[in-house]
Amino acid sequence: MAKAERSKYFNFYILNIKLRKRTNQKNLAPEDYVRVMRKVHREKIHEESSPNKHCIFRFMFEEKAKNEVEYLSGTFAQFTFIQNERWFNLKSLDMDEEFKVPEGLFPDAKITDYVFIPKAHRFCYRTSADFNISPYAIRKFLEKALDKACRPDEFVQVDVESSKESIEAILSAREIKKLMIDINYSNVDIGSDLKKFVEEDIKASNTSRFQVVATQKPDVSIDVEQSTILSGALQSAISDGEAEAVIIDENNRTKRIKTSQFPRKESIYGVKSRFNQLVFEKIMRIFRNNGN
């Protein structure tokens, strides 16, 4: 008799993928995201995720509803990328001119599950003791691989979702000495009016990235809430960029807070075979009102 699956918690990171047109401000459709993702998988495109490490999609399956792709899912791998160069032999203590790694074989592979939701343009991957790779490494892979699969008039921007606690830590500081924000704009995401104001302004100006640096007056904290631009940009940094602040904490110590130190990690509870569906449902609840 087959052993029943046990329900447990599964954790995952979230990356925000935005496919853009170079020549206009049009938001590309979910099917465009599917097209680009499929091409990366079909052509076995592998790209660097960190020094000497590459990633590649192993499998990619579709889940459809009403003739639309709800999500893509499968597994991807990170491996050590070795190029045949000069090898040193520890036995002979000399260069081995004959040795070559068999073509197409790479060591130290780690494999995990992923889910990509085109309507929310979010890429999620399961993290575990066996696959605890930084989402910033996965972002590097996705940006390079997806860029290769784009049409000539398209480009890709990828951001790691940060936790709201990172912004709250900045805003609750006793004193904000300096604030640096680097953002782009979202693709039909839900958000506050301030966030929408800043992002629509960036979009209207044909700007791909927007950077702002705010420095305090002597001995006076930056008041973020009194600035429409700073408030909106800081909220945008959660999903569409990064922020960094130099603050004075309650113990009068100078600290540096970066949103990149607080990647958003979500979890679902259920059996492993339902991981993809549960992630899809949660992402749609978070980033799309009523799944629209």
Q: What are the roles of these predicted feature ranges?
A:
Residues 114-126:
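Glycine-rich, often proline-containing surface loops adjacent to acidic residues and nearby aromatics
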